[in-house]
Every structure is written in structure tokens, then in C-alpha cells.
Amino acid sequence: MHSGQNKKMTTVLELRNLTKKFAGDVTAVDNISMSVEGGEFVTLLGPSGCGKTTMLRMIGGFEYPDAGSVVLEGVDITDAPPYERPVNMMFQDYALFPHMTVESNIGYGLRISGIESRQVQHEVGEMLELIDLPGMQNRLPSELSNGQRQRVALARALIRKPKILLLDEPMSALDAKLRQSMQIELLSLHKKIGITFLMVTHDQTEAMVMSDRITVIRDGAIEQIGTPTELYDHPVTPYVAEFLGQSNMIPAVVQRSAADRLIAQVGSNELDVTNATIVGRIDNNVTLCIRPERIRLLESSSEVDTSLEVITGVVQQVLYSGNSLHFTISLDGNRSIHVHHPLNTVFN
């Protein structure tokens, strides 16, 4: 998880009841309201077609909402064209001009704004240092690696010092190893310059690693907003629990409850759990969310600590994944759960 900013932040962006429909009465964004604080790294996370990129495009001015408003630092920019908005967007395909050098690509926005050539060269040089590509100003995009092209696109988006940088799946074209490296570089850059970043991705790990806060989008609506820790440890719906990492969704029946705890019947077992474990409830029927890595395996012959909540089961399958073992455990009532254990902790 990104460390975020310690200083007091102020709201830089507000989306108020934002709605967008396309042909055939398809609702891409459904009455969404949210805010972003200055200096935050916020991610819009969801599967393809959930509306997250449409949200980003409405903030950038590339789409216009059917209802609602986009407010930047207290100013309504809903109907403003892209060139009048103090935001820049880094597109998924980078959109570099193939016939222009690195210097010309990065400095393009400054030149069309009428900035003198000497000043443009100076600022481009600073950007090349910032993105760790000094001396590459005369190269063409075709002479760069994929990661280098991404950095050039990033520098071009940042050189005009936008209030918000919009990132549309910025690492989707990179292989796994380069993607991890670029995540670290992007976070370092965000920390250096302090500009608000708003990123779209479908990659849960990427969102968890990079974000101060994550907005989970489902079918054009917000499912939950929170820090990576809040969303992982305290999902409010089964969808969030299962979208962010693997989860055991266990049906149970409430026997009794008090304060923030309850006794839940799972098959022939009773568990004392916190309300935060519940991700769905209808009357006394609840769904418990328990992460696979937070279950400890004990042999049936072991002496059990009475302070532990215990359910009995039978190991059905064991999979080796390098640094851990993944167990499938069958429970009463034709149910099963998954358990992940580091190699050196199994049955300890």
C-alpha cells in the first residue's frame, strides 16, 4: 500500500451524482459521487466494462455526463473542453507521435501553449532527469523500449503540471517483471512531485500496492471506497471480498449476538466472530468472509487452544505454489474452504 501524504489534504476533485448512458440505454456510470484529496493516489478498480474508464474520460473532458457534475477545486468543469481543464491523461497506448523525437513529444504541450523554445528545452531536460532518461531527447519512440515509451508518455502528461494526472491502465502493455518495476518508479515519482494521481486498472494487486485509496466499481456504481487495508480486511459486500484476493465465503446462521460480536453456526460448529467478518446478512442467515491465509491448520490429534475458534474438516487437495501450500478442506454440509500456508508453518 502506498504511504500517502501526511500533511493535511484538501479536496481537489468531486464527482457529484455522475451518470452516463450510451446507445441502447446502457448505463455505463450510474449516479456516482466521490471525492479525491490533493496529493492522493486513488485507483478506480473493476472488471472490463464496469464504467471506470468512462468515469476517467468524463473527468478529462473526453466524454460528457448525461447528469451530474465534475468539480475541480470548487469550480464546475462539467462542460469544459479538455484543453480548458487543468488535468492531463496518460492513455493506455501512450499515444506518442511516432515522427517526433522524445524531446518534441514531451514538450509538445508547452510549445502549442506558446512557451519559448529555450524554456521548453529546459523543462524537457528536467523531465528527462525526473524519469531517468537523460540524454535520450533525440531518439524516436520506435528506438525506445516499452518501459521507456511509458516514461516519455508520463513526462509529456506531467510537464504542464496538471492538478490531476489521469492514468488509464498505464501498465497493461508491460510484462510482469517490468510492471513491478514501473509500479515502484511511478510511486516514487508521485511522492517527488506531489500531484494527485487517479488511475484506472482491473489489476487488484496493482491497486493494492499503489493506492492510498481504492474505489471498487461494479456495473457503473461504487461498491466500496477505502484504503487497501480497509477493503481487504473489512469488505462490505461479497463482491468486494472476492474481487480483492481469494476469500472463503461461508454461509452461517446467527445463534446469538452482542455488541460487535456474534455466535454463528457453521455446520455442526459454532464460531465466535466479529461483525466485521460478515459480508452479507438476511435475517439470521449470514455470509462470513475468511481469508485463506488467516486460517491455521491443526492435526486432529493436536491439543487445541481453547481461545481459538475451531471447525473440523478433511483435507481433499494440496497444491504446491513455490513458497506456500494451498489446501482445499471439506466441511460439513458439502462445503469446502481454501487454506494457504507458508511451507514452514504447516501443522505448527
Language-model features: where?
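ABC ATPase nucleotide-binding domains
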Residues: 41, 80-242
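The feature captures the beta-strand-to-loop junction immediately N-terminal to the Walker
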Residues: 45-47
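Helix-to-loop junction immediately C-terminal to a conserved catalytic motif
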Residues: 60
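Conserved coupling/switch loops of ABC nucleotide-binding domains, chiefly the family-specific signature
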Residues: 66-69, 119, 219, 251
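Conserved ABC transporter NBD signature motif
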Residues: 68-76
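Non-catalytic connector elements of ABC transporters
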Residues: 247, 257-348
